[in-house]
């Protein structure tokens, strides 16, 4: 799938707001993000800094692990560049506003690596297919 500026503009703030709202209910404080080109969000809870990458899924509907239609969750390999400073990688369902997430240290493991040819990009890209039971659902 190629990058769509229209889809980004439509869903980026929506996804980040859903995650922010969820974090606030869990006692996090949203803090300014110092890196415009890094992960999407930073939060603090009890003096510990957390980092959050947020993507929105508009073509897959789920409310929980049980009704998620696949056995694995596919995470983009190009986000691996941020793994030196661990982060939570989140997907937000546009229809249900449910969040699924996994920690970067869990995602970026050789056993989950898959390479696929992406027609719209004309290249092979790396993905990580993490078993859905290893993800967090909220």
Regions found by a protein language model. Give the residues of each.
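Interdomain/boundary linker segments immediately adjacent to catalytic/signaling cores
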Residues: 1-17, 21
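Non-catalytic C-terminal interaction segments of nucleic acid-processing enzymes
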Residues: 25, 44-46, 94-138
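Active-site beta-strand-loop-beta-strand hairpin of nuclease catalytic cores
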Residues: 21, 25-26, 42-53
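Intrinsically disordered, low-complexity, compositionally biased regions/tails
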Residues: 19, 42, 81, 124-126
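Charged, well-structured alpha/beta interaction segments
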Residues: 29-45
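Short, well-structured alpha-helical interface segments that form or flank functional binding sites
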Residues: 14, 18, 36, 84
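Catalytic cores of nucleic-acid endonucleases
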Residues: 3-9, 26, 31-32, 49, ...
């Amino acid at each position: 799938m190629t990058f769509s500026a229209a889809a980004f503009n439509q869903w980026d703030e929506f996804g980040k707001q859903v995650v922010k709202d969820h974090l606030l209910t869990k006692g996090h404080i949203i803090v300014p993000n110092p890196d415009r080109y890094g992960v999407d969000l930073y939060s603090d809870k009890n003096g510990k800094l957390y980092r959050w990458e947020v993507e929105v899924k508009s073509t897959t509907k789920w409310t929980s692990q049980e009704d998620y239609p696949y056995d694995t969750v596919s995470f983009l390999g190009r986000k691996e560049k941020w793994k030196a400073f661990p982060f939570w990688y989140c997907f937000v369902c546009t229809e249900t506003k449910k969040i699924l997430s996994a920690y970067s240290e869990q995602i970026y493991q050789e056993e989950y690596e898959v390479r696929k040819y992406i027609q719209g990009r004309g290249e092979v890209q790396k993905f990580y297919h993490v078993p859905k039971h290893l993800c967090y659902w909220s």
